[in-house]
Protein backbone atom coordinates (compact mmCIF):
# COMPACT_ATOMS: atom_id res chain seq x y z
CA UNK A 1 0.00 0.00 0.00
CA UNK A 2 1.29 3.47 -0.91
CA UNK A 3 0.80 6.41 1.42
CA UNK A 4 0.22 9.70 -0.41
CA UNK A 5 2.19 11.93 1.96
CA UNK A 6 4.12 11.24 5.14
CA UNK A 7 5.84 14.10 6.91
CA UNK A 8 7.44 15.02 10.22
CA UNK A 9 8.89 18.22 11.62
CA UNK A 10 11.91 18.91 13.81
CA UNK A 11 11.86 21.96 16.09
CA UNK A 12 15.07 23.99 15.96
CA UNK A 13 16.22 25.71 19.20
CA UNK A 14 16.99 29.45 19.35
CA UNK A 15 20.79 29.11 19.46
CA UNK A 16 20.98 26.76 16.45
CA UNK A 17 21.02 27.69 12.75
CA UNK A 18 20.14 25.17 10.04
CA UNK A 19 20.94 25.64 6.35
CA UNK A 20 19.72 23.42 3.53
CA UNK A 21 21.63 22.96 0.28
CA UNK A 22 19.51 20.49 -1.65
CA UNK A 23 19.39 17.49 0.66
CA UNK A 24 22.51 18.46 2.61
CA UNK A 25 21.75 19.69 6.14
CA UNK A 26 24.25 22.03 7.82
CA UNK A 27 23.70 22.61 11.55
CA UNK A 28 25.54 25.45 13.35
CA UNK A 29 25.52 25.78 17.11
CA UNK A 30 27.57 26.98 20.08
CA UNK A 31 29.89 23.94 19.96
CA UNK A 32 30.55 23.98 16.21
CA UNK A 33 29.15 22.94 12.85
CA UNK A 34 27.94 19.56 11.58
CA UNK A 35 26.92 18.71 8.03
CA UNK A 36 25.18 15.63 6.72
CA UNK A 37 24.25 14.55 3.23
CA UNK A 38 20.88 12.87 2.61
CA UNK A 39 21.14 12.75 -1.20
CA UNK A 40 20.80 8.97 -1.23
CA UNK A 41 17.27 9.23 0.24
CA UNK A 42 14.46 10.50 -1.97
CA UNK A 43 12.69 12.95 0.38
CA UNK A 44 11.86 16.66 0.42
CA UNK A 45 13.51 18.83 3.09
CA UNK A 46 12.19 22.34 3.79
CA UNK A 47 12.44 25.01 6.50
CA UNK A 48 9.12 26.32 7.88
CA UNK A 49 8.09 29.54 9.60
CA UNK A 50 9.19 33.15 9.35
CA UNK A 51 12.30 32.55 11.42
CA UNK A 52 12.96 29.15 9.78
CA UNK A 53 12.73 27.42 13.14
CA UNK A 54 11.26 24.12 11.94
CA UNK A 55 12.61 21.56 9.53
CA UNK A 56 10.04 19.52 7.64
CA UNK A 57 10.73 16.15 6.00
CA UNK A 58 8.23 15.06 3.33
CA UNK A 59 7.96 11.71 1.56
CA UNK A 60 5.41 11.38 -1.25
CA UNK A 61 4.04 8.03 -2.42
CA UNK A 62 6.24 5.84 -0.29
CA UNK A 63 6.00 2.21 0.67
CA UNK A 64 6.63 1.05 4.22
CA UNK A 65 10.45 1.00 3.95
CA UNK A 66 10.60 4.44 2.34
CA UNK A 67 8.27 5.98 4.94
CA UNK A 68 10.61 4.81 7.70
CA UNK A 69 13.34 7.07 6.28
CA UNK A 70 11.30 10.16 7.27
CA UNK A 71 11.67 9.48 10.98
CA UNK A 72 15.27 8.34 10.47
CA UNK A 73 16.26 11.69 8.96
CA UNK A 74 14.46 13.54 11.78
CA UNK A 75 16.39 11.50 14.35
CA UNK A 76 19.70 12.22 12.61
CA UNK A 77 18.97 15.96 12.58
CA UNK A 78 17.92 15.89 16.25
CA UNK A 79 21.22 14.17 17.09
CA UNK A 80 23.10 16.86 15.14
CA UNK A 81 21.25 19.61 17.04
CA UNK A 82 22.02 17.89 20.35
CA UNK A 83 25.66 17.52 19.29
CA UNK A 84 26.24 21.21 18.47
CA UNK A 85 24.45 22.39 21.63
CA UNK A 86 25.32 19.83 24.33
CA UNK A 87 27.96 17.55 22.77
CA UNK A 88 28.26 13.81 23.30
CA UNK A 89 30.34 12.07 25.97
CA UNK A 90 30.98 8.33 26.24
CA UNK A 91 32.70 6.86 29.29
CA UNK A 92 34.61 3.58 29.02
CA UNK A 93 35.97 1.40 31.82
CA UNK A 94 38.87 -1.05 31.77
CA UNK A 95 37.94 -4.51 33.07
CA UNK A 96 40.67 -6.97 34.03
CA UNK A 97 41.05 -9.98 36.29
CA UNK A 98 44.84 -10.12 36.66
CA UNK A 99 46.96 -8.01 34.30
CA UNK A 100 46.12 -4.31 34.70
CA UNK A 101 45.38 -2.70 31.34
CA UNK A 102 47.56 0.38 30.83
CA UNK A 103 46.04 3.09 28.62
CA UNK A 104 48.12 6.02 27.36
CA UNK A 105 46.71 8.93 25.35
CA UNK A 106 48.98 10.29 22.59
CA UNK A 107 48.79 13.17 20.08
CA UNK A 108 46.46 15.44 22.09
CA UNK A 109 43.77 12.80 22.57
CA UNK A 110 43.60 11.51 19.01
CA UNK A 111 45.54 8.26 19.56
CA UNK A 112 44.95 5.67 22.29
CA UNK A 113 47.69 3.16 23.20
CA UNK A 114 46.61 0.04 25.08
CA UNK A 115 49.41 -1.90 26.79
CA UNK A 116 49.67 -5.02 28.96
CA UNK A 117 46.29 -6.39 27.78
CA UNK A 118 46.21 -9.98 29.16
CA UNK A 119 49.93 -9.48 29.86
CA UNK A 120 50.77 -9.24 26.15
CA UNK A 121 53.80 -7.23 25.02
CA UNK A 122 51.98 -6.05 21.88
CA UNK A 123 50.90 -2.39 21.96
CA UNK A 124 47.45 -1.78 20.52
CA UNK A 125 47.06 1.63 18.90
CA UNK A 126 43.60 3.01 18.15
CA UNK A 127 43.19 6.29 16.27
CA UNK A 128 40.13 8.34 17.17
CA UNK A 129 37.78 9.51 14.43
CA UNK A 130 38.20 13.19 13.42
CA UNK A 131 36.50 15.53 15.89
CA UNK A 132 36.65 13.06 18.81
CA UNK A 133 38.92 13.77 21.79
CA UNK A 134 39.87 11.05 24.27
CA UNK A 135 41.13 11.66 27.79
CA UNK A 136 41.83 9.67 30.95
CA UNK A 137 39.40 10.40 33.78
CA UNK A 138 40.91 12.08 36.84
CA UNK A 139 38.02 11.20 39.16
CA UNK A 140 37.69 7.50 38.35
CA UNK A 141 40.36 4.82 38.07
CA UNK A 142 40.66 2.95 34.73
CA UNK A 143 38.19 5.22 32.95
CA UNK A 144 38.39 6.79 29.50
CA UNK A 145 36.26 9.75 28.39
CA UNK A 146 35.44 10.29 24.72
CA UNK A 147 33.92 13.63 23.71
CA UNK A 148 32.74 15.06 20.41
CA UNK A 149 29.87 16.70 18.55
CA UNK A 150 28.97 13.90 16.13
CA UNK A 151 27.32 10.95 17.90
CA UNK A 152 28.29 8.55 15.13
CA UNK A 153 32.00 9.44 15.31
CA UNK A 154 32.05 9.28 19.14
CA UNK A 155 30.28 5.91 19.29
CA UNK A 156 32.41 4.56 16.42
CA UNK A 157 35.60 5.56 18.25
CA UNK A 158 34.33 3.79 21.38
CA UNK A 159 33.61 0.70 19.28
CA UNK A 160 37.14 0.75 17.82
CA UNK A 161 38.62 0.81 21.35
CA UNK A 162 36.33 -2.02 22.48
CA UNK A 163 37.15 -4.13 19.41
CA UNK A 164 40.89 -3.58 19.90
CA UNK A 165 40.64 -5.46 23.21
CA UNK A 166 38.81 -8.56 21.99
CA UNK A 167 40.11 -11.81 23.48
CA UNK A 168 41.21 -14.32 20.85
CA UNK A 169 41.33 -18.11 21.18
CA UNK A 170 39.99 -18.12 24.75
CA UNK A 171 36.61 -18.76 26.34
CA UNK A 172 35.09 -15.26 26.40
CA UNK A 173 32.72 -16.29 29.22
CA UNK A 174 35.78 -16.67 31.44
CA UNK A 175 38.12 -14.03 29.97
CA UNK A 176 36.08 -10.86 30.40
CA UNK A 177 39.06 -8.49 30.12
CA UNK A 178 38.63 -5.47 27.87
CA UNK A 179 37.59 -1.83 27.69
CA UNK A 180 33.82 -1.40 27.59
CA UNK A 181 31.39 1.52 27.31
CA UNK A 182 29.99 2.17 30.78
CA UNK A 183 28.04 5.39 30.30
CA UNK A 184 26.61 7.47 27.46
CA UNK A 185 25.63 11.09 27.96
CA UNK A 186 26.21 14.70 26.99
CA UNK A 187 29.15 17.00 27.75
CA UNK A 188 26.92 19.80 29.07
CA UNK A 189 23.88 19.07 31.16
CA UNK A 190 20.54 19.93 29.55
CA UNK A 191 18.65 22.61 31.47
CA UNK A 192 15.40 20.99 32.53
Curated annotation (Swiss-Prot):
PROSITE patterns: RIBOSOMAL_L6_2. Component of the large ribosomal subunit. Coiled coil: none annotated. PANTHER family: 60S/50S RIBOSOMAL PROTEIN L6/L9, LARGE RIBOSOMAL SUBUNIT PROTEIN UL6. It is found in: Cytoplasm. This is Large ribosomal subunit protein uL6. Disulfide bonds: none annotated. Belongs to the universal ribosomal protein uL6 family. It comes from Bos taurus (Bovine). One of its GO terms (biological process) is cytoplasmic translation. Keywords: Acetylation, Cytoplasm, Ribonucleoprotein, Ribosomal protein. The modification N6-acetyllysine is found at residue 121. The gene is RPL9. It comes from the Eukaryota. InterPro entries: Ribosomal_uL6-like, Ribosomal_uL6-like_a/b-dom_sf, Ribosomal_uL6_a/b-dom, Ribosomal_uL6_CS2. One of its GO terms (cellular component) is cytosolic large ribosomal subunit. GO terms for molecular function: rRNA binding; structural constituent of ribosome.
Amino acid sequence: MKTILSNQTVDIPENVDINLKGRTVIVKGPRGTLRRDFNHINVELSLLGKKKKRLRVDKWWGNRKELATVRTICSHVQNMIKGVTLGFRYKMRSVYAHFPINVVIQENGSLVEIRNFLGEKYIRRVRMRPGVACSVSQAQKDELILEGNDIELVSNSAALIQQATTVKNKDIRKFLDGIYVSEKGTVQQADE
